[in-house]
Amino acid sequence: MRVSDARPLMGVAWTITVYAGDRHAGDAAIAAGFAEARRLEQVLSDYDADSELSRLSAAAPTPQPVPVGDDLWRLLVRAEEIRGLTDGAFDITVGPLTTLWRQSRRSGKLPRPDKLAAARAAVGGDALRLDPKLRGVSLRRPGMRLDPGGIGMGYAADRVLAVLAALGIDSAMVDASGDVVVSAPPPGTAGWRIAVAGLPGDDAPDAKTLVLSQAAVTTSGDARQAVDIDGRRYSHIVDPRTGIGVSGPAAVTVIAADGATADALATAASVLGPDAAADVIDGVPGCSARFVWQAGDGIEHCTTAGWPAD
């Protein structure tokens, strides 16, 4: 029996859909899934000053490694792995820059050079150190702020799917406002049908509905979150290496084996652009991507080698 419910969590709409033996079992599983998402919000939120992540950021710089819980540790380990894969195009220490650009989007003015320099000084891979023996985290620079926005939603969706599986739900979809993870297909189908997001006017044959199982998919880009300042468009996604908001408009959809990977690689791909991002994505087993961007009055698009065929 198909059972589905939607609730606001982590500042966005979440939908959990399961196939269960009966409605009671489905409702119970979904309730457990939402409870897990709420628990993770208390760990990973960078808006809640009392979350574990926010308390860690507030302690920067930390003279000694700070022990953290399992979820924050796993998130940071994967974030550092993706940072290495992308040569810093994804960097969870980008928080000071995203905060600064959030203010710029509200004011309609570019960040002041001195403030941009100060924020950049608090960002970078060598600013974060992980101690596997202690499961401890060192934040080595003043003013650091961890930003889980490019990986946290995907990670949380993964953990919710794991909770559903532990309750005997073999076929489920968790949709965290576009960060989608799925397990086995619905009964009698080849997979879960998931629409690919893009840009207005994107009607190419590969802008379609995906059919996925045991996979995750995320779309990232500035199609809906951007600001025009001094005649130039800036995304909400900031390049951690330069401190500047990505210019667009563009969108990238990434398919991966898990939500955290899809989420982080989609963010990195928005920074890198199609060519450099394709080199990274082609090297990750189970990953593929579709890129779409505005080119004059038209829409251009391309896909990596592993993107599902029409």
Predicted regions and their residues:
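Mature catalytic core of soluble alpha/beta enzymes
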Residues: 1-310
